[in-house]
């Protein structure tokens, strides 16, 4: 007699982000390049690129420096962000909701994470990269996972000690051209 265990993974901590839209800091904003011609930032790393938050709390400012007004504070370790510009040791970042601001580079990590996109339902974490693969867990929108690899339309993710595959279009934090076969 066999049985199946179905695990529902939910977001454990809210992230704080202002609902207000940011005014652009045009003096410091670089144009976003097409994915095929990714520019290099001041750090020598490609722009844009994905990173994650290193600590439990990370301030976001209106401009690249401590004298710029504080806009909000993220309170969610490993939240994926997209670096879209650099100025000295500051990074202009965009989150999965489209909010932008500047963060000190030391608050960010190159470790890759993804967040399940907002939708009306949980996403199935599969044992193999196929819609017919065995169910490992159901993952709620807003849950963060560690990105391990992608294969076609699927990405291998570790979520709360569960390993499996999520559809690439159901997560934010990876470009369509990354991990190409």
Walk through the language-model features, giving the residues of each.
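N-terminal intrinsically disordered, compositionally biased regulatory/targeting segments
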Residues: 2, 18-19
């Amino acid at each position: 007699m066999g049985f199946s265990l179905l695990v529902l993974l939910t977001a454990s901590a809210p992230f704080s982000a202002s609902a207000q839209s940011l005014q652009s800091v045009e003096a410091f904003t670089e144009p976003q390049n097409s994915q095929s011609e990714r520019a290099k930032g001041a750090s020598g790393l490609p722009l844009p690129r994905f990173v994650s938050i290193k600590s439990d709390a990370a301030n976001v400012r209106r401009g690249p420096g401590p004298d710029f007004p504080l806009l909000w504070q993220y309170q969610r370790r490993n939240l994926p962000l997209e670096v879209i510009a650099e100025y000295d040791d500051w990074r202009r970042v965009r989150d999965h909701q489209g909010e932008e601001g500047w963060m000190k580079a030391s608050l960010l990590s190159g470790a890759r994470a993804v967040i399940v996109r907002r939708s009306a339902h949980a996403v199935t974490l599969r044992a193999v990269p196929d819609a017919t693969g065995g169910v490992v867990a159901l993952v709620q929108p807003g849950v963060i996972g560690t990105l391990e690899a992608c294969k076609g339309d699927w990405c291998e993710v570790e979520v709360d000690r569960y390993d499996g595959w999520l559809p690439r279009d159901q997560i934010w934090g990876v470009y369509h051209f990354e991990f190409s076969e």
